[in-house]
């Protein structure tokens, strides 16, 4: 097993030939609630340069932003951009319309599991069907891994998964 730390914005990782784990610090996370049929939602989509996903498990990606569907009127914006700027731009787009823009960057941490055995490792503690026909790249859902509630996102076909547990459960 190899351990590496590559600086404050790169993952801290442990690797074997079957899977690697890492922690990605400093991901901007903004919780967004808005009526998807509203003019405010249209303005937010223009600000993010991406549509808000409208279906369970879907995500959209544009530049530094990934938008994960959490519910019919709720999304989590994950971004490599500055948290203050992202939240401020989204608040401006929301304007005076009903809704919520909340910086929740300190609320969760980001763990990554990647490699040919990553799916099998997750299947040991996750009740979700992770078979590629059921869950694949570009999908994100709320689930549990062991006793810990997480937002689980599959990034690619390697497979690489990003897990977003609440900070109180972080390692």
Each PLM stretch: what is its role?
Residues 1-171:
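Basic, glycine/lysine-rich polyanion-binding surfaces/domains
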